Amino acid sequence: MGKYFGTSGIREVVNEKLTPELALKVGLALGTYLGEGRVVVGIDTRTSSEMIKHALVSGLLATGIEVVDIGLAPTPLTGFAIKLYNADAGVTITASHNPPNYNGIKVWDRNGMAYTPDKESELERIIEEETFKRVSWMEIGEVIKADPKKEYIKNAVEQINLENSYTVVVDSGNGAGSIVSPYLQRELGNKVISLNSHPTGFFVRELEPNRKSLDMLSKVVREVGADVGIAHDGDADRIGVVDDQGNFVDYEVMLSLIAGYMIEKYGKGKVVTTVDAGFALDDYLKPRGGEVIRTKVGDVAVAYELSKHGGVFGGEPSGTWIIPQWNLTPDGIFAGALVVEMIDKLGPISELAKEVPRYVTLREKIPCPNELKQKVMRIIEKLALQNFEYKNLIDIDGIRIENEEWWILFRPSGTEPIMRITLEAHTKEKAEELMKKARGLVKEAIEKAKLS
């Protein structure tokens, strides 16, 4: 993790670490790195997004870059617009599922894939050295206003094949997805009921579309007898799903179902996921001809492996999915359309989910200062060896220890000052026993790091 960029671009508290001054420098650095060309810029609904956007755009213009300002736009729309307008890069001003006092800057390449750590490191070098390109008054870039929504919806509809119409409840979480996701479902011929569809930076619910935050969506799906509920985070790069019975579908289960459907739709092939994905995906895909490849957490790592191996699908157990036949940008909106297509072809999710093997997955977050994370991870590796009997240790992203019965992943967040523990076991009792032990281990490591 660099000085500014984490696992998902820059993501910090507004007017503390993420300031207009920093946004200006990022714009200058990106324009300097590109040398010339066109950059698409979109924002989410946060109160600070316009402020950050204008500062960043000023930096781009100062280097002679032409800016295509698409205004309020979910991340998937920015990724789509990069190709639509033949741009050299794109920028989304968003903090995704983080609290409203956060914002962020995420950069995309000309293929719609997030900038790799190497490219972000180059931007950081330019910022630190302040070796910014500055053009003369005659060469300053211009801003072009554009709206790619209709083209996005038109192209998405052409990719989805529905034989029937469905009742779909869409909870946009007051985020940028509210201007696209319900409209795409309607254009597909579905009856749409919208929740939290007014774009605002004062979010009604927690932005992460998980079981806890989607009580209202579950209730509405049950009350109206809907076929499915679709939910998004602030920039709609994620998807959460509620089945036809009004039950939230666990991320791991939904990941397995949609990956299996993509194999059925496009043929046998590789599925890319991250180190925090559990056993279910492997068990579900193996008899269907799917090969699972694991990589670092973050959509850029998934997208890179997809492009490298030619996979049919990539996804994280956080509801972040990449459909390479569509784009290398994580897209919760197009994912929602695919979910309905899966229902159309295979049947209700409540029935499909019964085929996915079930394990007990637990997750916890423990506060940890960013400056201590590296030291804490070194201590965790030593303590894990002393406290757990495991067969394999995987350290491509954090530390994952595992055997045939369970696995535990210790990983520092790349976007927040926390340590994450993710684990899976065959029984609830074993999972809780492992979490108690893992929690104590992380807290001990943090205390030791503070003293050393």
Curated annotation (Swiss-Prot):
EC top class, as a word: isomerase
Modified residues (Phosphoserine): 96
One of the GO BP terms on file: carbohydrate metabolic process
Pfam families linked: PGM_PMM_I (PF02878), PGM_PMM_II (PF02879), PGM_PMM_III (PF02880), PGM_PMM_IV (PF00408)
Keywords: Isomerase, Magnesium, Metal-binding, Phosphoprotein
UniProt remark on cofactor binding: Binds 1 Mg(2+) ion per subunit.
Domain of life of the organism encoding this protein: Archaea
Signal sequence, start to end: none
Reported function: Catalyzes the conversion of glucosamine-6-phosphate to glucosamine-1-phosphate.
Annotated positions binding Mg(2+): 96, 233, 235, 237
PROSITE patterns given in the database record: PGM_PMM
Family: Belongs to the phosphohexose mutase family.
UniProt PTM: Activated by phosphorylation.
Cofactor: Mg(2+)
Entry's EC annotation: 5.4.2.10
UniProt source species: Pyrococcus furiosus (strain ATCC 43587 / DSM 3638 / JCM 8422 / Vc1)
Stored PANTHER family: PHOSPHOMANNOMUTASE
Active site positions, chain numbering: 96
Name of the protein described by the UniProt record: Probable phosphoglucosamine mutase
Molecular function, one GO term: phosphoglucosamine mutase activity
Reaction equations catalysed: alpha-D-glucosamine 1-phosphate = D-glucosamine 6-phosphate
Gene3D superfamilies, sorted: Alpha-D-Glucose-1,6-Bisphosphate, subunit A, domain 3, Alpha-D-phosphohexomutase, C-terminal domain
